[in-house]
Amino acid sequence: MLTPKRVKWRRQHRPDRAGKAKGGTKIQFGDLALQSLDVAWISSRQIEAARIAMTRHVKRGGKVWIRIFPDRPITAKPAETRMGSGKGSPEYWVAVVKPGRIMFEIAGVPEETAREALRLASHKLPCRTKIVKRQEVGEAGEG
């Protein structure tokens, strides 16, 4: 599972949930990609589950790129603990995903196979998604 190697601070404030993605909204590596339509916290376990679903479907062919990284710690206090006594300890890591963010890319397999792999991955994620295709230079919508 994905976690940062080292962090400056063990505990962070809760991430902001408003607005659209500032960067990471264009396909950089693959031919097809999975794009977020909602704001969501995606845990390292969910990212790993989606990756496994994709790689199992494409078998040995193709390449998958993960474009998000869980760099925010989410803390929790133990059950039945009274309020106070400081902030809880980090439980898991999340990637803050906003609308428009490209989360996964895939290449090297037929389009139908890639679409199905991305569809399977989308079922493992807590947000609505859409599958987008790389626009070739000179196609509509560019320029």
Swiss-Prot record:
<keyword id="KW-0694">RNA-binding</keyword>
<dbReference type="InterPro" id="IPR020798">
    <property type="entry name" value="Ribosomal_uL16_CS"/>
</dbReference>
<protein>
    <recommendedName>
        <fullName>Large ribosomal subunit protein uL16</fullName>
    </recommendedName>
</protein>
<dbReference type="InterPro" id="IPR036920">
    <property type="entry name" value="Ribosomal_uL16_sf"/>
</dbReference>
<feature type="compositionally biased region" description="Basic residues">
    <location>
        <begin position="1"/>
        <end position="14"/>
    </location>
</feature>
<dbReference type="InterPro" id="IPR000114">
    <property type="entry name" value="Ribosomal_uL16_bact-type"/>
</dbReference>
<comment type="similarity">
    <text>Belongs to the universal ribosomal protein uL16 family.</text>
</comment>
<dbReference type="GO" id="GO:0000049">
    <property type="term" value="F:tRNA binding"/>
</dbReference>
<comment type="subunit">
    <text>Part of the 50S ribosomal subunit.</text>
</comment>
<dbReference type="GO" id="GO:0022625">
    <property type="term" value="C:cytosolic large ribosomal subunit"/>
</dbReference>
<dbReference type="GO" id="GO:0003735">
    <property type="term" value="F:structural constituent of ribosome"/>
</dbReference>
<dbReference type="InterPro" id="IPR016180">
    <property type="entry name" value="Ribosomal_uL16_dom"/>
</dbReference>
<dbReference type="InterPro" id="IPR047873">
    <property type="entry name" value="Ribosomal_uL16"/>
</dbReference>
<dbReference type="GO" id="GO:0019843">
    <property type="term" value="F:rRNA binding"/>
</dbReference>
<keyword id="KW-0689">Ribosomal protein</keyword>
<comment type="function">
    <text>Binds 23S rRNA and is also seen to make contacts with the A and possibly P site tRNAs.</text>
</comment>
<dbReference type="GO" id="GO:0006412">
    <property type="term" value="P:translation"/>
</dbReference>
<feature type="region of interest" description="Disordered">
    <location>
        <begin position="1"/>
        <end position="23"/>
    </location>
</feature>
<keyword id="KW-0820">tRNA-binding</keyword>
<dbReference type="Pfam" id="PF00252">
    <property type="entry name" value="Ribosomal_L16"/>
</dbReference>
<keyword id="KW-0687">Ribonucleoprotein</keyword>
<keyword id="KW-0699">rRNA-binding</keyword>
